[in-house]
Swiss-Prot record:
EC number: 3.6.1.52, 3.6.1.-
InterPro entries: DDP-like_NUDIX, NUDIX_hydrolase-like_dom_sf, NUDIX_hydrolase_CS, NUDIX_hydrolase_dom
Pfam family, one: NUDIX
Binding site for P(1),P(5)-bis(5'-adenosyl) pentaphosphate: R42, S62, K73, D109, R176, R193, D195
Family note: Belongs to the Nudix hydrolase family. DIPP subfamily.
Organism from which the protein derives: Schizosaccharomyces pombe (strain 972 / ATCC 24843) (Fission yeast)
Gene: aps1
Reaction catalysis annotation: diphospho-myo-inositol polyphosphate + H2O = myo-inositol polyphosphate + phosphate; P(1),P(6)-bis(5'-adenosyl) hexaphosphate + H2O = adenosine 5'-tetraphosphate + ADP + 2 H(+); P(1),P(5)-bis(5'-adenosyl) pentaphosphate + H2O = ADP + ATP + 2 H(+)
Domain Nudix hydrolase: 40-203
Gene Ontology BP annotations: adenosine 5'-(hexahydrogen pentaphosphate) catabolic process; diadenosine hexaphosphate catabolic process; diadenosine pentaphosphate catabolic process; diadenosine polyphosphate metabolic process; diphosphoinositol polyphosphate metabolic process; inositol phosphate catabolic process; intracellular phosphate ion homeostasis
Binding site for Mg(2+) 1: K73, E93
Name of the protein described by the UniProt record: Diphosphoinositol polyphosphate phosphohydrolase aps1
Residues that, per the record, bind Mg(2+) 3: E89
Amino acid sequence: MLENNGSVILMEPDHLRTAVNRSMTSREGRTKNRFNPITGARLAAGVVALSADKRKVLLVSSAKKHPSWVVPKGGWEADESVQQAALREGWEEGGLVGHITRSLGSFKDKRPTDTIDRRKKYLKQLMSKSSGNDVSTNTELGAEAEKLLLPPRAECEFFEVIVERLEDNYPEMRKRRRKWMSYQEAKEALTSRKDILAALEKSSIIKEEN
């Protein structure tokens, strides 16, 4: 249903209502993004969007790396709830309209960060907290230890969504492709994205093909 302000209200099974403004313009920039104050990781929200029979999941092509496949996800901004952010990303990147059935939890994108200063700050905080020593003066911290202590690039809260319909016109329709995939197809497509794959594994997608 629509409210007077144009927001779309979706009734979810737990009787929570999530208002989503389906604008035709994607949000850009990071001025409103949320960040973990300790790790510096960007806080994100995303959807594992399933077909009504739960046999397929909707993947979208990455805007930065082709022909890589991902699920709709992006920054959780300061003026919205995490559920609103997840559904907004589903709309902007995949043109999907649906309802949240449950939270899948928070998952860390542990691919190496390209922000060296953030890495050093995180390591310094960890070492100071654990031993009272400044990491910059601790000569025992080797390359392997540093690798293990790398801060996550992002921390994403994923939600399982049942897709009600896919719109032909949506904000990123010229930037991305979208494709329904079976569990096995999606598993192969997401081999380089362990965070997304872990969220898929926790979803209710049917894993056995008849």
